[in-house]
């Protein structure tokens, strides 16, 4: 598996207490994946960490073989990764919900006009913004290289993950024009 087959799910913080617990900063929308016996990869290593105990109330986690404070300090600031395949199995989506990794690189259209492709997703509190890298033909016409479309029904009509396409309303091109 290559690096593109994995997704960041958490960052580990400082130790908490004396028994080896560390603060877990969830980088995903799925806290349910952090449970006893769940395993995660550490970037640039083949080492896997297995959860011995997870406390959802204070977002602390204890990993097997790191059950004392000195050993647990080695985990501070590490990023945990999960395979995309395992994420699909363990993280259940509701209707009209999508994984970030499925949205990224999708082409964005308004009717038959290709506006660009999604290069990032920003959380703005109550909603999300798709960061769109404009299609080269729009850049050549002096439109911005980057613009943002809110992930709201007013702007996004349909997302087709299998075709890697997002279809927008007429307001999407207005956003590009006025960015």
Swiss-Prot record:
Alphabetically list the UniProt keywords. Answer: Chaperone, Cytoplasm, Ribosome biogenesis, rRNA processing
Question: What's said on domains?
Answer: The PRC barrel domain binds ribosomal protein uS19.
Which residues does the UniProt record annotate as the domain PRC barrel?
95-174
Cystine bridges: none
Q: Return the protein name.
A: Ribosome maturation factor RimM
What's this chain's function?
Answer: An accessory protein needed during the final step in the assembly of 30S ribosomal subunit, possibly for assembly of the head region. Essential for efficient processing of 16S rRNA. May be needed both before and after RbfA during the maturation of 16S rRNA. It has affinity for free ribosomal 30S subunits but not for 70S ribosomes.
GO process annotations (BP)? ribosomal small subunit biogenesis; rRNA processing
In the UniProt record, the signal sequence range is none
Subcellular location, in the record's words? Cytoplasm
MF annotations from Gene Ontology: ribosome binding
What interactions and quaternary structure are annotated?
A: Binds ribosomal protein uS19.
Using the UniProt record, give the first listed, main subcellular location.
Answer: cytoplasm
TM region positions: none
Record Pfam families: PRC, RimM
């Amino acid at each position: 598996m290559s690096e593109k087959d994995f997704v960041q799910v958490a960052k580990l913080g400082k130790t908490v207490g004396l028994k080896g617990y560390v603060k877990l900063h969830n980088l995903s929308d799925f806290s349910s994946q952090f449970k006893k016996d769940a395993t995660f990869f550490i970037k640039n290593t083949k080492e896997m960490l297995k959860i011995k105990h997870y406390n959802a109330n204070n977002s602390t986690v204890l990993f097997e073989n790191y059950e004392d404070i000195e050993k647990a300090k080695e985990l501070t600031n590490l990023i945990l990764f999960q395979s995309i395949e395992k994420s699909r199995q363990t993280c259940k989506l509701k209707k009209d919900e999508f994984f970030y990794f499925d949205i990224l690189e999708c082409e964005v259209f308004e009717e038959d006009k290709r506006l660009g492709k999604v290069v990032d997703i920003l959380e703005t509190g109550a909603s999300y913004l798709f960061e769109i890298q404009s299609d080269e033909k729009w850049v050549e016409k002096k439109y911005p290289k980057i613009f943002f479309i809110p992930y709201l029904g007013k702007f996004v009509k349909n997302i087709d993950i299998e075709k890697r396409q997002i279809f927008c309303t007429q307001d999407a091109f207005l956003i590009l024009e006025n960015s």
